[in-house]
Amino acid sequence: MRIFYLLSILPFIGGFTIHSSVSPQPSTFTPLNIYNGTPGGRLNRDLRATLPINELKGNPPSEGCPILNLHRCKNPSMYDKNDNIQMLSNPIQKTRGFLKLIRYKNILPTLLLTTTGGFLQTQSITQLLKSTSFLASSMITVCIMASSMILNDLFDIHVDKINNANRPLVTGEVHPQEAVTYAALLLLFAECLTRYLPQQMQMVANWAIVNIVLYTPLLKRIPLVKNISCATIVAFSLYFAGKSATSSVATSPLLYVAAHTVFFGSLHNELLLDIRDIEGDVKNHIRTVPGLFGKTVAWSLAAIGMVYNVVKISTALSVQYSPAPFVLAMSPIFYHLYQIRRQHYSSAVIKKAVDFTNVPLLLSLLYFCKISIS
């Protein structure tokens, strides 16, 4: 049953590879068309003879090159087998490309989120490590996170050529068909792992899979909805792991507090990243809050969200705990928001602020864990 469920959503992914063998090949850069020929990546024999020659290795190719990050072949009739083809088939190169594609640096923060959720619910690391359902939920969360990154890059190749030109699908380190295969395998593995979850959490996992499949082609095109959807998935990973760690129906109040904090932290980051990427989004007709209403409106929403979160959580904590450590941990975020406005929404300042946001969030989660066992 789970396999049929997964197959029902794969057409959204497989749409990248569906094409007609008799229809003319497109000339634009699309997920199907990095090589301007067949999706399998092999160049047309007629096309090979027309490729321009660039003797300088390492230079980015000029417009019209079917491979985006490799230097031109010395012989216009074929690729240098010792250079380009070897790079394409090199397992180490492919592994690096895959790790970049899934944004592997997010794996550790993701596991920290799931561990925090599990600990807030059980107050025991030992119990977590012995819980098959918790371990399965953590693996499912990582797989969903990784596959969402792949799907995002597949749909946004045009945008990444402007905003993130070093992404592996843009540089050619990973071919779109390979990316589709990676995403499908990750989702299949995640779906198989749901059998180890409590019954109610299995439906939650299925909902998350559907959400990330629909996110980039549908939800991401709706201003603010896409920001809320992304923040919800991130925050819900913590709640999902916590509820999977135990069969208890009761939910720790601190689990709600932590999920609330992570949600607004993620929403803050999403809005700031939209400000940073406004140029590419506007050129590619992607509707975002800063693109439609201006950078100031997007910045204001991010700031208001963080103020609301700090006030709401501080009020909730003050009933039984001291909110001072939480407020202190979150305060640097407001300093960075001030710097973003002061520096006229500089991309470098925004990147620094987004990267730093993880520190206050981590400190807040550690504080929640501490008071959960006090």
Functional labels for PLM-detected ranges:
Residues M1-Y35, A49:
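N-terminal chloroplast transit peptides
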Residues H19, F29-P31, Y35-S374:
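Multi-pass alpha-helical membrane architecture of UbiA-family
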